[in-house]
From Swiss-Prot:
Quaternary structure note: Homodimer.
Presence of the UniProt keyword Amino-acid biosynthesis in the record: yes
Top enzyme category: hydrolase
Pfam families recorded: M20_dimer (PF07687), Peptidase_M20 (PF01546)
Highest rank taxon of the organism: Bacteria
Active site annotation, chain numbering: 68, 133 (proton acceptor)
Pathway: Amino-acid biosynthesis; L-lysine biosynthesis via DAP pathway; LL-2,6-diaminopimelate from (S)-tetrahydrodipicolinate (succinylase route): step 3/3
The entry's keywords: Amino-acid biosynthesis, Cobalt, Diaminopimelate biosynthesis, Hydrolase, Lysine biosynthesis, Metal-binding, Zinc
Protein name as catalogued: Succinyl-diaminopimelate desuccinylase
Length: 376
């Protein structure tokens, strides 16, 4: 079996449902230490992380990823045990196959192959791996980055191994992500009998015009790299469940996905201004999951674009679509951040899989990128 596929299978066999690492990181660490990496284990709360580095000079290329996976869902819906990798119809099945144990395996084998051919490479190679990406993402990459930043440690380039390919392997490199800002809004009224509305104040009715106005706003037009900022309601709850009671409060949860045309503070101020103008009695809690980031050009994009084209024959598209990733934290200590990995069609689904032929190709793309940036 191909070495990258073999390692991917070993990782899939470990039930690393978030935030449990289940020994995946120690498997990777053992191989990295054999080729000269210094490894720093960083455990925060129940989360395992490690920061590994080979070399002490600049420039530094970092590979970043996560060993944790999402829950399997109903086992009866799987064709086979989700933690027993199975090869069928040209695909490797198992939870985490695409998101992102194939990428983790490809990181390791690409580095092993590169170091074997270039033991005295330029600069440094690093890995940042966490078991807290699919969960709350507080004690994972964010905490590691904060530790690195506190001691003044930065790096030049980072490849996050997220499954970015959309229709065929190699078609997409993510060179940025939108920011994510969520709000939990509680509007207060006066509860009462539904037959006596003059003795109550219905907060749903009070809020409705403000919600309609928020939904109609064109926040910006986007730009060459990002689509327009989006505001969406995710949940609304009000009332006791009874049909004869006017509720005393209504709670609305919403989310902004915002481009570099906006700032979190600017969006917050706009929402507060609108709610105040409508005269609402409200409380509003905010949660900023991450600011937008963008790597428009640079040596890393040039290197990985060339590697993808040489291995797959496809010139990849650069885009910033999709949800957030740990790149939102890494950007604080890294000059250029991109994401590249296998097809994402089955991630978080039952019968998650990755094409068998794509796994060694992924390793070769990472190896060629390393060679382009760090070979002497």
């Amino acid at each position: 079996m191909n070495p990258t596929l073999e390692l991917a299978c070993e990782l899939i066999r470990r039930n690393s449902t978030t935030p449990d690492d289940a020994g995946c990181q120690e498997l990777m660490i053992a191989r990295l230490e054999r080729i000269g990496f210094t490894v720093e284990r960083m455990r925060f709360g129940e989360v395992d992380n490690f920061w590994a580095r080979r070399g002490s000079d600049s420039p530094t290329l970092c590979f970043a990823g996560h060993t944790d996976v999402v829950p399997t869902g109903p086992l009866t819906a799987w064709h086979s045990d989700p933690f027993e990798p199975v090869e069928r119809d040209g695909h490797l099945f198992g939870r985490g196959a695409a998101d992102m144990k194939a990428s983790l395996a490809a990181f390791v084998t690409a580095i092993e192959d590169f170091v074997a051919g270039h033991p005295d490479h330029k600069g440094s190679i690093a890995l940042l791996v966490t078991s807290d990406e699919e969960g709350v993402a507080v004690h994972g990459t964010r905490a590691v980055v904060e530790t690195l930043a506190a001691r003044g440690e930065t790096f030049d380039w980072c490849i996050v191994g997220e499954p970015t390919s959309a229709r065929q392997f190699g078609d997409t490199i993510k060179n940025g992500r939108r920011g994510s800002l969520s709000g939990k809004l509680t509007v207060k009224g006066v509860q009462g009998h539904i037959a006596y509305p003059h003795l109550a104040r219905n907060p749903v009715h009070l809020l409705a015009p403000a919600l309609a106005e928020l939904a109609a706003i064109r926040w910006d037009e986007g730009n060459a790299h990002f689509p327009p900022t989006s505001w969406q309601v995710s949940n609304i709850h009000g009332g006791t469940g009874a049909t004869n009671i006017i509720p005393g409060t209504v709670e609305v949860q919403f989310n902004f996905r915002f481009s570099t045309e906006q700032t979190a503070d600017g969006l917050k101020n706009a929402v507060h201004s609108l709610l105040d103008r409508h005269g609402l009695d409200y409380e509003l809690e905010w949660n900023l999951s991450g600011n937008p980031f963008l790597t428009a050009t640079g040596d890393l994009i040039a290197a990985i674009e060339t590697a993808v084209k040489d291995v797959t024959g496809i010139m990849p598209e650069l885009n910033t679509s999709g949800g957030t990733s740990d790149g939102r934290f890494i950007k604080d200590v890294c000059r250029e951040v991109v994401e590249f990995g296998p097809l994402n069609a089955t991630i978080h689904k039952v019968n998650e899989c990755v094409a068998v032929e794509d796994v060694p190709k992924l390793s070769e793309i990472y190896r060629r990128t390393l060679a382009s940036l760090l070979a002497r």
